[in-house]
Amino acid sequence: MLRFIIFFSLFIHLCVAAPQTPAAAAAVPAKKWLTLNGQEPAVVARGGFSGLFPESSASANDLAIGTSSPGLTMLCNLQMTKDGVGLCLSDIILDNATTISSVFPKAQKTYKVNGQDLKGWFVLDYDADTIFNNVTLVQNIFSRPSIFDGQMSVSAVEDVLGTKPPKFWLSVQYDAFYMEHKLSPAEYLRSLQFRGINVISSPEIGFLKSIGMDAGRAKTKLIFEFKDPEAVEPTTNKKYSEIQQNLAAIKAFASGVLVPKDYIWPIDSAKYLKPATTFVADAHKAGLEVYASGFANDLRTSFNYSYDPSAEYLQFVDNGQFSVDGVITDFPPTASQSITCFSHQNGNLPKAGHALVITHNGASGDYPGCTDLAYQKAVDDGADVIDCSVQMSKDGIAFCHDAADLTASTTAMTIFMSRATSVPEIQPTNGIFSFDLTWAEIQSVKPQIENPFTATGFQRNPANKNAGKFITLADFLDFSKAKAVTGVMINIENAAYLASKKGLGVVDAVKSALAKSTLDKQSTQKVLIQSDDSSVLASFEAVPPYTRVLSIDKEIGGAPKPSVDEIKKYAEAVNLLRTSLVTVSQSFTTGKTNVVEEMHKGNISVYVSVLRNEYISVAFDYFSDPTIELATFISGSGVDGVITEFPATATRYLKSPCSDLNKEQPYAILPAEAGGLVVVADKEAQPPASAPNPPLEAKDVIDPPLPPVANLAASNATGGAQSHPPPASGTVANAANLGLSLLAMLALGV
């Protein structure tokens, strides 16, 4: 079928990049796992790669096998048709995962299932041919791609077994309900003679006991599934919380248990981890394996994980105290890389690639940006280069802060609302600007963690949203020397405005601070000077140890030689947006530019920014996984550095042996094929093609010479004295800013 031809072309690079022999794996020290049997935890794909494609579709199953570690287990949720055919579908009700409600709009029914009345379209009301010939699958989680809806057929159990997955797990959720309606999952399994079925799980004790002898003869493992602690198990009429009190009794009919992950690592109401329970230790003591369910890259889970799905897996398999025996996941490649590549690293492996990990305002995904805590976290997380965007106070103090406007990342609005002004040379909206406040006034406000995705309800580490303190440029440089980081990046913006309108020489302030720190006279630590103004970079030409970085803050589609030649007059590197390297439309990558290659031909290094962990900022092609995005830019595009708000994620990837595609190994973290996923969908379902980004023009690189610093020193030397704008303009500014002020106060909870 054409669909499969296209689908497999998407992943043909797997055959190219995968090792031909696992011989090199022998050089890797064997890992010691704290599982029941000491073996590596299993990766169990719930319905294949159901995080992208509809659950248990052929595409979901094929992609799971093609992108996961070799020992993958495929999980199928068994549902039964009226004529006794077994299907792989997420639930007994079909309307959330198929097109059945539009095919048979008046066929809705109500059944009592495990004591509850459920309304919908039930699979047992239809024979298999009706399902296969009329009904197609849809994605049943609305944050996931919908462009594949209605294009993929429902899979029978035999269809999935026919793909010969490494291991196969059948989940039987509703035995008692089916038995009430004269359908027997046990007899269905006997008709298959349990062939190819490695694991069977169920939340019903009676069902597991009924197939115990048959499963034993077939060497099929039986797993008892725990539901919500307050739910009632149908056979015993006991709550699952009661059954949990006697795990040893489960050993009589099962070899392991499957539990929601919060049975092991509970999360409090503020979405932070509570101490681990003793569930795994208790189950292992009883001789039971423990499998944890509920893993997905696109779920909002504990803030402790910093939106990094790999960090969550590691919490369950590599915490130094215990390890679960397997994880049930909708994104099997992420589980595979976490277990195979990231576990037992202990932070001491050398980085596999040469790419630099450069921070964006320190570890600003975890703490307010440009604070002492954000920088300390960045160092702890292994960042190579920490950055300081230099702002100037009214009294001439250079300090680190993301922008001249303090409203988004401080509590300035609650104190200095009346000082909001309009500076169109800097931004189109009103703001409270650092150059209108003294350093003492700036220190009187609290930092505030920035949430780029607040509009979608995403928060960042709210327990520390106002933690830390601002630091001066001089203190930042002292810190970087004391911590012996590989380098620092000093970002300079608005230099012309500050010099001509405010009498503040930010370039001179940076030069002076670097000279006092002696970083201008050594080669041990890198010094990167970044600006979007070529004249600023030109002023640092006389200091050879510095690497000058031109920040290009617009999307470009190419870098012709004249433009690259112009850049070389001012800079040795560029900082480019992600979408200048890989184009994206509606969260799908659509293509790859040649900008990196064109820059490299001119001996210009390329850094890409800004990388974030939140899954809504990560394209579907990257599997909603920030690690795959890193691999795409580093291994795929060949960038020289990544600028990130979550340096721990980037460092973990680069320290993993799986990031080095030149080594033969059983598993590798591969870059995504830009534009490869969207073509799997029918043409009419694909997002509309967008116009290509224009190439960078040479004239876009050139900026006017910097003006001299205006002689406003006398007014700027008044310390804490406040200079108010003229009444007329001040009134206009305050009135224009009233809406902004009220919105900011509401956002801050004032």
From Swiss-Prot:
Signal sequence residues: 1-17
Transmembrane stretches, start-end: none
Enzyme class: hydrolase
One protein family per Pfam: GDPD
The keyword Signal belongs to this UniProt entry's keyword annotation: yes
Tissue-level expression: Expressed in flowers and siliques.
EC code: 3.1.4.46
Record's keyword terms, sorted: Glycerol metabolism, Glycoprotein, Hydrolase, Signal
Name the UniProt record assigns to this protein: Glycerophosphodiester phosphodiesterase GDPDL7
Species name: Arabidopsis thaliana
